[in-house]
Amino acid sequence: RRQGVRTSRKRVARIMSEYGWRGTTRGNARRPRGTGKQAAHAPRVPDLVGRDFSAKGPNEAWFADITYVRTRQGWLYMAAVMDIWSRKVVGWSMGPRMTAELADDALRMAISTRRPGPGCIHHSDHGSQYASLLMGRTMRDAGIRPSMGAISSPWDNAVTESLMGCIKSECVHARTFDSREQAVLEIFDYIEGFYNPVRIHSALGWLSPDEFEKANWKGRTQAA
């Protein structure tokens, strides 16, 4: 579409059928024990987003989530932070355990690379990692406002759910990596070599996150 070529789903399906191609799907993969655990007795955090997945500029709202990938060494967990303005992954961290430190490392990477001004929103689910004292301190020190969607409502964090779905279907896709190291290297290459610079989004006018930022960042500062 962005090259001016008119097409339709039926035409794409016909061409794929002629060449014997099959698209990838996002199935219900097995998940490790303990994922989806909500924080017990955590302080109440308001929803500052309200399913508004848009922003007028960079660093107004970041969305965060954690996913998991199977390897022959065991599960690998990945925490990611996305800037909703450009859909760019601005922070990520991977490790063998789903801890507060994992989520905090991804947030600290985002803070280091983006240097947001006071008032940037960090939106997540109610997972114990995001409700931790460690995350609270990091956000407070950076002037970031915490935000959490409703409990057990994936629609409140739909953009990062979509990101994790892309990683599963386009990078992992029914594979079992030999080691966590192999998974880390391939997911890193997917994010930095494809998702941010190449993968187009309809919400960005069929531009990739990097292309969108290059076209729209002019005259802006790193701070929101």
Task: Set out the residue ranges of the language-model regions.
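Charged DNA-binding/catalytic regions of mobile-element recombinases
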Residues: R1-A224
